[in-house]
Amino acid sequence: MINFPTLEIGDNGLFVYIMQAALKYRGYSVSINGAFDMATFAALKAFRHEHYIEGDTVCDDITWKVLFNY
């Protein structure tokens, strides 16, 4: 299993790209550019809210698991 890092606004790179692609696949309006910007923040916030994930609006271990259904 891959250990995904916790991501927050301002982060950049491959894992942000993967998170954006997963959000896009699930129907959220987000650019896949590898930059955790305000649009990514809004999409992630909506995803977390719709899946009853409490806490900070970061992409953490719980969020990754729900994104990938494992």
Region roles according to the model:
Residues 1-34:
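Acidic, Ser/Thr/Pro/Gly-enriched interdomain connector segments
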Residues 24-28, 49-53, 64, 68-69:
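Sec-exported extracytoplasmic/periplasmic mature domains
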Residues 44:
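Conserved hydrophobic/aromatic packing and binding residues within compact polymer-binding modules
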